[in-house]
Amino acid sequence: MKKTLLTSLFVITVALCSAAEPYFRATWVSTVANIDFPSKAAIGNYEQQKADMIAMLDEFQKMNLNAIVYQVRPTADALYPSELEPWSHWLTGKQGEAATYDPLEFVCTEAHKRGIDVHVWINPYRVTLPAMNIEDLAPNHMYHKHPEW
């Protein structure tokens, strides 16, 4: 009986002293229609985009967030170098036009400096938005590659 009680007490003590998993304190960073990033004023201005992202991450760090959910595929286009999808016009101003930096790599590097994890968010079904002009879609956009869809 005494041995069982001591064993139970030991197990309970170890369980209570174990480090708890940190809470997931995150925010979404939406890129479609330039809701959060990049600002409309920074489209095509990559140094301004970097400065804006650093300011956002600094603010998230002050808010004690430990993760962001970063939208990297808003309208069948990409905010990272991709062989499958064109560059996003929300980033460059013209769909298919390459940025001079890798925004996803930049976000990951800067977020990790602040102890913030990055989770990517893709929209697998959204091809365009009503306000988008079909003629402005890049030749390698899904709309042109798979019209049967």
What does each of the following model-derived ranges do?
Residues M63-A99:
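Aromatic-lined carbohydrate-binding/catalytic grooves of carbohydrate-active enzymes
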Residues T4-V14:
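Sec-dependent N-terminal signal peptides
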Residues A19-N66, Y70:
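Mature N-terminal, pre-catalytic/accessory segment of carbohydrate-active enzymes
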Residues S30, N34-A51, Y125-W149:
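Active-site-adjacent "subsite" loops/lids of carbohydrate-active enzymes
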Residues I43-M63, W90-R114:
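Aromatic- and glycine-enriched glycan-recognition loops and surfaces
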Residues L9, V32, R73:
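Flexible loop residues that form catalytic
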Residues Q71-L79, F106-Y143:
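Substrate-binding cleft and catalytic face of glycoside hydrolase catalytic domains
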